[in-house]
Amino acid sequence: MPARFSAALLAYRTGDQGPEVFLVHMGGPYWAHKDEGAWSIPKGEYDPTAESAQEVAAREFGEEVGLPAPSGPWHDLGEHRMPSGKRVRTFAVHTDADLAFVSSNLFTMEWPPRSGRVGEFPETDGAEWFELDVARRKLVSGQVPILDRLADAIR
């Protein structure tokens, strides 16, 4: 099976209690009533022979949040291998922008499984700022090590 690659952009800011990160809540019926472990860093798959990780990270942020990626210097947090084997290249950007969820692109899937009914659902259905300790609980478990990389990078 060929390797799968994703690129991500983790926006962060300095809050009253320390660093805060901007995460998106995964959309679709499976995630609708879940909170802890149901949030993600905006990201998307790409072919590294056809696109740059930075271009994809910016595009995916826009698609999943509905706003352009924050401007400012991007910090390369490197590549992280997910439990699925997918390789995620993450960039971080500090921002003072008042980011908020606007809209998300849609995807099509059969729901409930094996029902024969196909519907369109938002890829993400919300976004919020979280302090790092809270973000560790909210974030899907495979992405939590990325928060450690951010914490190390901004010390």
Regions found by a protein language model. Name each.
Residues G15-G18, G28-W31, D47-P48, S84, ...:
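Short, charged/polar surface micro-motifs in flexible loops or helix N-caps
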Residues S104-I146:
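NUDIX/MutT-family hydrolases
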Residues M1-I41, A69, F91:
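N-terminal strand-loop-strand
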Residues H33, T49, K138:
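Residues that scaffold the ATP/ADP-binding catalytic core of kinase and kinase-like folds
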Residues E79-G116, E128, L150:
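Active-site-adjacent beta-strand/loop module that shapes the phosphate/pyrophosphate-binding cleft
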Residues I41-L77, F91, E131:
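The catalytic Nudix box helix
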Residues Q143-R155:
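C-terminal/domain-terminus segments
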Residues S40, G85, E120-E123:
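Short glycine-enriched loop/turn motifs at secondary-structure junctions
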